[in-house]
Each structure stands twice: as structure tokens, then as C-alpha cells.
Amino acid sequence: MKYHSSNLFAGEVEAMGSARASKSLPLQVAAVCFRRRGPAVEFLLVNTNGGNKWTFPKGSTDARLSHSQAAEREAAEEAGAYGSIEPRHFHLYLHSKGVFWQPEGVQEFVVKAFLMEIHDLRGREEPMRNPTWFSPEDAKKKLAKGREVKYARETEAVIDRALERIHFHSELWGQYPEHRHSRTLSR
């Protein structure tokens, strides 16, 4: 399914498995950053703008960039992370921002998640983000802490799907080691 707009419509969100949306939702993109440590995989998370929660590097789309390029930009800006990103998203999830007692209320977003293997960390534009590596289980806990149960389930599914893709590609690359460092992830 291709999306050409920065908004997803209710039918498309319901096709993702959620009946919560009855209107068009704004779109964000996330870089699900990972690295390999021998047989182990770690995920890179950043602090939210408020600093007390963890998230994937994510942000708005940009008409001048593809969605994967926008996710790659977020990884660089928020985490100083550079590497190989998949050209297509591997998962969609819902994200709520804000609190109901504030004047702005709660805003829901549909987030396209792009898998990105990190090869280098260097200076970042947003120093308060504190990029940190976590095991898959610790990443799930950090993403869930202080959040609604539905968001915790959404991000747990992102980690699980990412691990499936990483392990699939690891098995494939194991058969063709000469291609290991000259690829972008795709399936």
C-alpha cells in the first residue's frame, strides 16, 4: 500500500488493525535504529523533548524528501546516527502526543517506521536527546514507561517486527557475506 499524502485516512489506519481512527491523522516518520553486537541486537532510543520518556528518533515529513529520507534526517538530528536505512517502511503504528488537560489536548499521529542499521554516531543538533543503546527487552520497557498501555503495545510490536526483519536479513546475508557492508535493507 503506497501513501502519497502526509495524512492517512481512517480506512488505511483500520487496515493496520486499529479501529480508533475515524478521521484523517497526520503522518510522522521514525527511524528504528539498531546495531549488531555479535549475535545480539541493540536499539537506539532518544529522550522525548520533555526528557522523561524514551522514543525512536521521529518527526514530520518533508515534501522535498522521501519518507525514508525524512526518517534518516530525524536519526541524524536527534541522535547523531548515520547508517543504512530501508527505502520502505516496515511497520505503521499510532502515537499520541500531549495531554488532555492542556489547551492543545492530545494529538494522534500515524507513524511510518523505517529500519536503519547504524554505522556511525557523531554530533547531533539536539543535545538534550541523550541517545542510548538498549537491548530489545530493555527498549520495550523504556518505550512503555510512563505511557498508555496501547502505546506500549504499539511500540512492542515495532521492536518485534524489527527483530524479525533483522534476523531474516542476517540469515540471508550469512549466505552472501560479500554483500554484508554494501547494502540497504530491503525485502
Regions found by a protein language model. Name each.
Residues 52-53, 123-187:
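Nudix hydrolase/Nudix homology domain
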Residues 36-42, 104-106:
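Short, solvent-exposed loop/turn segments that connect beta-strands within catalytic domains
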Residues 32, 45, 113-115, 133:
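Conserved hydrophobic/aromatic beta-strand scaffold that supports enzyme active sites
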Residues 2-38:
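Acidic, metal-coordinating catalytic segment for phosphate/diphosphate chemistry
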Residues 76, 80-122:
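Active-site segment of metal-dependent pyrophosphate-handling enzymes
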Residues 35-38, 117-122, 136-138:
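Short loop segments at secondary-structure junctions
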Residues 39-82:
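Conserved Nudix-box catalytic region and its N-terminal flanking loop in Nudix hydrolases
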